[in-house]
Structure formats: structure tokens, C-alpha cells
């Protein structure tokens, strides 16, 4: 198959939905010969917010230390290949097509059929093996206990801040969600966690004690280094990343940490496009993937530090599984006007439903049929434009702003 044919087949497997469980991915990884080789270090990352940024920091710092690193994250923003990186480079189209062709032939013989995420994980691990990666960083897709990435034995486990998200799958209390994510902890393997609410901390400590996994909680942000990603929360993510690499026996020093954090590139996380780079804009355009109330709180803090006293023309969209009323409650005070649009996703919330979820004291709002029209209206206000509510929206917006072919996804 060509690359486009291969990804078309892959995206067609999204019809199989999400299947939590480890038997399927274990079978697929075993039959595709994708399990990491002996001696390869694996870092496994779960949590609600900050997973991608923390993974990207670990990858960048490890590469600055001279390690050949494989990075598996989700979702992608613009191009599927973003999910699978070696040494900071996306998997090439030709190798992606070859791997997916082999996987299609294998999957046709398997019952039940592997899911989109399981296939992506198998493709990533096979590519990491071919590239002789010394370190592999795996971000969970959802939860932890039954996430496909948990089929891969890890040497270090990382827990980023935990909040309420994916409640239809993981439970509707912090304790239930924490238990799902704590299940990635392995007997005797070191683990490190971001600061957590007390009820979450208790769950993590109990889980660590049960499997005798040495667990450390980060107690202060990483200071004394320049960090490419804006916001005080990113210094906490940096501290978590450095601690995890230390547990993985990566030889760290000041220069490698500084180089990794300074040269880090992780789009869509308070990413600022200067006005001069956006046709028709007279103020910056900011993209942020905040898609739950906790992330919205973090975004509000970052906005107030970056744009003190300024309000945004906010372009907002969300998918149905998210607490968009809670997000809007926290972000509406940042906006002088709000422009709703449906994201390119079957689970997109209609603009009218988004508008109906606004708090009573919300600023003026308008609804549009697509992102391009909503963005065009927001730009005319002359205010900084904040595009937020979903990583799927951020991906669509980034493709629009960079004039890049967009591969929409539902997972």
C-alpha cells in the first residue's frame, strides 16, 4: 500500500472503537514481533494532564544526553506520523506504509480485530526496534490498567497530574481514576509522580505499596533552567521529566538538561503565532489543547501571566465526552467574545449546545458552521485569538494556519 492507502486503512479501523484490555495488544505485539529488545529501557507515562509535554521533555533531554530515543504519543495534531518519533523525527511515510501493510495482513487473521490504537502501538514498537532505540517513552492512550501500552513491561512509571476526564470509561471520582492509572506501577520498578490531591496521593501510595514499587512525589518545580514551553506548570512537568530520567539511569548534567528543555518543540500547548505570521491578524493567535477543567485552570493562569489585563477573542469547540460546561466556566472570564464551531470529529458538540453551556455572565458569543469561518470572525476583533477546547480543534487550526494537509482523527 502507498502511505495514503495505508493510513486510509488504518483510520478505517477506528470503527472498531476503543477496547480496553491487554490480551489483544499482547497477542498483536507478540505476533508482530514488536516487543522491545532486551536491554532497551522503557518509560511508561499515565495521567490526566501534561502527559504529552512531560514525554516530549524526557525525549528531548535524553536525546541531548546522546540517547537514541523512541517516542509514542497521541493524538496527533496534523499528521498521523507525529505519534511515532525516533530521534525527534516522525516515522517516514515509506516505512509507515510498509509497517501498516504488514499489520493489515496480520490483522485480517486476528479475531477480534485489533483497534486503531493497538495497531499504532505495534507499528511504533516495531519501528523503534528497527531503529535500535536505547530508550522508549510510551504515553498511555487512556487510563492505565487496561490501556494497550500497559502490555509493554516498563522500567520506570510516571504519573502526571490526575483530574476528572474520560469518566465514562475510568470512573467518576478522582479515587477511581487514580486507581486505573496507578495500575501501571510494576513490582520493584521505580515510579515518580507529580504533586496530586490528597485523595489521589493515597491511592497511588497504596498501589505502590501493594507491588513494592518505590514511589517518589515531586515536591518543587524545576528552577534555574530556561524552558521552551510557557507557563509555570511546565516547570513542574520538567521536574517530573528529569526525575524520571534519573530513575531510568540516564546520565544527566546541567548542559544536557538545559539543551533539551530549550530546544524542546511540542506544538499546541500555549503555542503563540505572532500576528505577522497570520494573514489579516493584528494580534497574536494562541493555540492550547486544554480539554478538561483542570487544564483550563492551568491555561487561565498561563494566559494571565502572558497577556496581563488582556482578554481574548476565543474560538472554542469540544467533543461530547468532555466536561465542556466546566471548561467554559473557567475560560469565559478570559474572553471578550466567544466564537463557537464544531470540530472535525464525529463526536463534535454542536455549536448551539456549546453556547447553551455558557455561564450566565459570559461575554457575547456567536456560532459558526466550521473553524475557518469562526476564526475569520475572531481575527476581525483585533484581540488576541485563543483557540481552545480540544486537541482535535488545535490540530485543525494548526493545519489551517500553516497551510498543511490535515489528517483528522477520532482517537
Residue ranges and their predicted role:
Residues 1-18:
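Charged, amphipathic alpha-helical linker segments immediately N-terminal to NTP-binding catalytic cores
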Residues 16-18, 22-31, 35-40, 64-152, ...:
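ATP-dependent carboxylate-amine ligase catalytic core
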Residues 41-45, 53-70:
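A conserved segment at the C-terminal end of the G1
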Residues 142-146, 153-212, 314, 324-328:
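Conserved catalytic-core segment of NTP-binding enzymes
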Residues 194-216, 280, 284-287, 328-384:
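C-terminal helical cap/extension that packs against the catalytic core
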Residues 374-402:
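A glycine-rich beta-strand to alpha-helix segment
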